[in-house]
Amino acid sequence: MTSPSPAFGVLLVNLGTPDEPTPKAVKRFLKQFLSDPRVVDLSPWLWQPILQGIILNTRPKKVAKLYQSVWTEQGSPLMVISQCQAQKLATDLSATFNQTIPVELGMSYGNPSIESGFAKLKAQGAERIVVLPLYPQYSCSTVASVFDAVAHYLTRVRDIPELRFNKQYFAHEAYIAALAHSVKRHWKTHGQAEKLILSFHGIPLRYATEGDPYPEQCRTTAKLLAQALGLTDGQWQVCFQSRFGKEEWLTPYADELLADLPRQGVKSVDVICPAFATDCLETLEEISIGAKETFLHAGGEAYHFIPCLNDDELHIELLRLLVQEQTQSWISAE
């Protein structure tokens, strides 16, 4: 007797990580990442010689050292935490729906791939799949890239599954509540700094002027979080991190802001990265280590990084709610 097929399956998607903190593995990862036209939309005739001839011959060794500074005995922080998220969400969903609901990971770049995630869900009998990109704010460089990868996979499938695709959740009540809880928990332990800095991953300014809603959604998230925390306008500020290349990106830049704040008389900051659902190189190294050094070197006295939501209970609850909202029509029709 075969087991009944699950009501649906869930594919949790994040950006990805190198398999190892080595130049070879990082080069392989960067090649795939930076070859995505959603990430770098320059003409391949212009971009690929730069990527293949310069970037992939200079950056992997440097970036590998950065990964080594945050790598754990269990592996990449992003991968370890993502696995915990998937396991806890599967447990939560299975209890909610009173049956086994499979949850698999799929990374836009690196392993496990989005294709392998679909294959695992199919092997478990899932004919309906919710694709849940772990990007609260929509951007063409992240969420649309996931959509492209899903669509590309489906072009090679004879019998495609029924799909639900969660585009964004930047203003979801449960998301704002989870962020607010993480900040309040931090304040309870460490006290409240003079200013809360909300650092979002940046994108080229051109993407925004061409219609990407990402910066507006980031500012909406920030405003809602500040309201939930009861902060005045002078107690919080938005910035954008991780810029790459010579093109102008969204401003203010995180490193420049944190270097300037002590000169404005701000001596203590708490920094949170709301656009990241999972701690990774950009939060654990760039913000928790590098940005801290920038702030303290400029004359700051106290710098605290507030971790991402990761596998916190309220975050898993949020993910469950997002899945329930996407599957409402499926369940009600049965």
From Swiss-Prot:
Subcellular locations according to the entry: Cytoplasm
One Pfam family matching this protein: Ferrochelatase
Reaction catalysed by this enzyme: heme b + 2 H(+) = protoporphyrin IX + Fe(2+)
Matches recorded under InterPro entries: Ferrochelatase, Ferrochelatase_AS, Ferrochelatase_C, Ferrochelatase_N
Any Gene Ontology CC annotation: cytoplasm
Lyase listed as a keyword: yes
Pathway the protein acts in: Porphyrin-containing compound metabolism; protoheme biosynthesis; protoheme from protoporphyrin-IX: step 1/1
Key words, A-Z: Cytoplasm, Heme biosynthesis, Iron, Lyase, Metal-binding, Porphyrin biosynthesis
Molecular function in Gene Ontology: ferrochelatase activity; metal ion binding
Residue sites binding Fe cation per the record: 201, 282
Keyword Repeat: no
Entry EC number(s): 4.98.1.1
GO biological process, one term: heme biosynthetic process
Major place of residence: cytoplasm
Coiled coil: none
NCBIfam families: hemH (TIGR00109)
Main function: Catalyzes the ferrous insertion into protoporphyrin IX.
Family affiliation: Belongs to the ferrochelatase family.
UniProt name for this protein: Ferrochelatase 1
Species per Swiss-Prot/TrEMBL record: Shewanella oneidensis (strain ATCC 700550 / JCM 31522 / CIP 106686 / LMG 19005 / NCIMB 14063 / MR-1)
Source lineage: Bacteria, Pseudomonadati, Pseudomonadota, Gammaproteobacteria, Alteromonadales
